[in-house]
UniProtKB/Swiss-Prot annotation:
Name of the protein this chain belongs to: Proline--tRNA ligase
GO BP field: prolyl-tRNA aminoacylation
Domain notes: Consists of three domains: the N-terminal catalytic domain, the anticodon-binding domain and the C-terminal extension.
Organism for this UniProt entry: Chlorobium phaeovibrioides (strain DSM 265 / 1930)
Compartments, as annotated in UniProt: Cytoplasm
Amino acid sequence: MADKITSREADYSQWYIDLVRSAKLADYSDVRGCMVIRPNGYAVWEKMQAALDRMFKETGHVNAYFPLFIPESFIAKEAEHIEGFAPECAVVTHGGGEELAEKLYVRPTSETIIWSSYKKWIQSYRDLPLLINQWANVVRWEMRTRLFLRTTEFLWQEGHTAHATPEESQEEVMRMIRVYKTFAEEYMAMPVIMGRKTDSEKFAGADETYCIEAMMQDGKALQAGTSHNLGQNFAKAFDCQFQTKEGVLDYVWATSWGVSTRLIGALIMAHSDDRGLVLPPKLATRQVVIIPILRGDKAAVLAKAESMAAELKENGIPAFVDDSEQNSPGWKFAEYELQGIPVRIEVGPRDIDKGVCIAARRDTLEKTELQLDATLAVQVSGMLSAMQADMFQKALRFREENTREVTDYETFKSAVEEGFVIAHWDGTAETEEKIKEETRATIRVLPEESDYREHYHMDEPGVCIFSGKPSSQKVVFAKAY
């Protein structure tokens, strides 16, 4: 119940943990750094999977599955890649009671094992493009973990594609980061800034990394998805060449892109409140709960509630009836607010006599009187659509209200404690690192979207807030998860 949840104002971090556990989304495991995703949480992941998988297939991708274990020699082939991931890797040294001749890495990501197969499959330009996605688990040995946001093992999808030209691979990189942006905004109701990472923040082994960044309710950023242009780096490491249309051998051009169960953490922190989870309707497995007020003719009330649920389900709205008598209606209201059911409908004998029922939206808690007639499904569908749109607009307003443009470092240091900061940067890794050391803020993204760039005059020349050197553009700074 909500009384088990610390308020956001009192302790935001504890609020998040309390909510995840109280809403039965996830729990700690006896395995250090790992979590158990409970049915309520996994249901959200399944909705995310279904939407993303459909979007991947609509853009020409197919699913496959590659081994969990990666030979050490494969990892070592891409020097920058192994340098980036080595500290996080789990390594298998024994199997079948004997020491292995070659160590096996538990995948932190699958570029190397996948490219060992691509080398065998790609011979000619006729084999390209190769567009494959994998749904899998990965392991990164995290020292400081937090449910959904950072765990040693997590679930994700990773796309790996091969192309004949650098132009095609760059098109793929941008196509997929736009898919992620569409998913975040249209399904998660979470506004994101799409753009490029700095060289210091890009993926190990990539030429360029693009990302989507979202603002959480505490003003911190959360990287919600990435898409990497790998150039020919992995193709060269695994000698993956193809014969071009001109009959010349060339290395293929590659991309990789992924999102993970981290999105569930983002969803929670972007929308939820002190009463519990607030779920966008598009990601709710159960969109409507009907609570019969069992007074007077109980049988008639139950029959009406069941017929309402049936009507909603016939119209594509997942609804269910809670007719249990061991808990009061008030207890049920609080429990389903905690679980984030988008719409609650209560109906009793007086309501039936008047031909109405009372519906409440989870995001606003506002109550609305609905007519108990043939338009019930249309009325509820309208509530769900309005809720989805309103949640996005609320999150967008919050981001705008908590984004500041600053021109001096002293103001920057205080502003970055409260939200996103737009400021000039001289383009050097040295300045980027010094700002990070002093404030724990990082450059989250170099925005690509023209409307965002125009709104904040990102291309105006100026001077770097830290070094005072000339700067050709502004960037987005924030503290981050």
